[in-house]
Swiss-Prot record:
Its main location: membrane. Keywords: Cell membrane, Membrane, Transmembrane, Transmembrane helix. The chain crosses the membrane at residues 9-29, 30-50, 67-87. The lineage of its organism: Archaea, Methanobacteriati, Methanobacteriota, Methanomada group, Methanococci. This is Uncharacterized protein MJ0606. One of its GO terms (cellular component) is plasma membrane.
Amino acid sequence: MDLEGKCCLIHAIGGIIFGYLANYVYTAGLGIFSGIATLIFLFIGAVIFGHISAKTFGEESLTQKQWLGCGVLPFFLVAIVVWVLKFNGLI
């Protein structure tokens, strides 16, 4: 598997974890700020997993454009899907 595939896999796993936890942030009782707090929570998760992949593969291994394509995009897509499934009680 190439470097971008490994980065995508790491971020997809992070998306599953943070998407599951995002439901608890959303239902924490923050009123109208719950959606904003959840998106900030997911953004922090993407940054955390970005640092994990940078330390794992080397800081110069991926450009910022590659990280946005193979890291951030899969993270948010997987996290939103898992969040919606958890919110609706399917998982």
